[in-house]
């Protein structure tokens, strides 16, 4: 897993026409989406958040095949000319994709071992969770931007394990195995974890709380995320300590 260079997210230009998306440098991502292709990848949509789905008028197929993935994207609102040249669908905002790049997307691991065994299996190397717009829980995924040291000598591995040995609902630990590659420059990377279907099942409450634990360079830390169960989505509200 290679580190990713991150740039600041763009800001709106108050003088820009509201009928089109606010100005953003084309080399910067302006959204984090879930790419959802149909069964034979003859079309796909991009889930922007809990309630907004986007239709890419200038792309017929997902560049990632039939696999559902999280991705960084730079897009703008489609113009009438874009729609005329491409395709449109009723009831869905149409956008023009400038570029899109997938991030590592993995399932959650169901815990079957003790805390000590987990460390041996999944690794015990430190990392930091970066609190920015890409660290978010939404659309059935927990997406994390993390920071660690990269020496370029080995592929780092990260896993999110559901801790069934902890008496707290929806308790997860993020494990990092640097495979001995613990010296080098500090860099960031993104990873997204697909929350299990049982977590998304409808319940009496709209939201539940997910607790995330990880080993940082200064000791064990935790953060909490509220996720929406009854719509299969997750809210972006989070808090850490």
PLM feature segments, named:
Residues 6-9:
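C-terminal motif of bacterial Sec signal peptides marking the signal peptidase cleavage site
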Residues 11-14:
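Bacterial signal peptide processing site
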Residues 22-241:
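First exposed extracellular module after export/assembly in secreted or surface-exposed proteins
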């Amino acid at each position: 897993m290679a580190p990713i260079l991150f740039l600041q997210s763009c800001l709106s230009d108050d003088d820009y026409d509201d009928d089109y998306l606010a100005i953003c440098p084309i080399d910067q991502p302006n959204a984090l989406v879930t790419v959802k292709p149909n069964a034979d990848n003859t079309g796909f949509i991009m889930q922007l958040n809990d309630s907004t789905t986007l239709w890419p008028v200038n792309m017929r197929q997902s560049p990632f095949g039939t696999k559902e993935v999280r991705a960084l994207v730079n897009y703008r609102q489609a113009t009438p000319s874009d729609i005329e040249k491409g395709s449109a669908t009723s009831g869905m905002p149409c956008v023009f994709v400038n570029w899109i790049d997938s991030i590592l997307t993995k399932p959650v691991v169901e815990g079957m071992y003790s805390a000590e065994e987990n460390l041996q299996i999944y690794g015990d190397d430190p990392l930091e969770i970066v609190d920015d717009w890409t660290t978010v829980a939404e659309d059935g995924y927990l997406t994390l931007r993390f920071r660690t040291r990269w020496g370029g000598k080995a592929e780092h591995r990260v896993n999110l394990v559901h801790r069934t040995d902890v008496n707290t609902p929806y308790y997860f630990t993020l494990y990092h195995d640097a495979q001995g590659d613990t010296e080098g420059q500090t860099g960031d990377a993104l990873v997204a974890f697909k929350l299990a279907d049982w977590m998304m099942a409808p319940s009496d409450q709209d939201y539940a709380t997910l607790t995330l634990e990880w080993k940082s360079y200064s000791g064990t830390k935790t953060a909490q995320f509220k996720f929406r169960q009854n719509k299969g989505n997750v809210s972006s509200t989070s808090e850490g300590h």
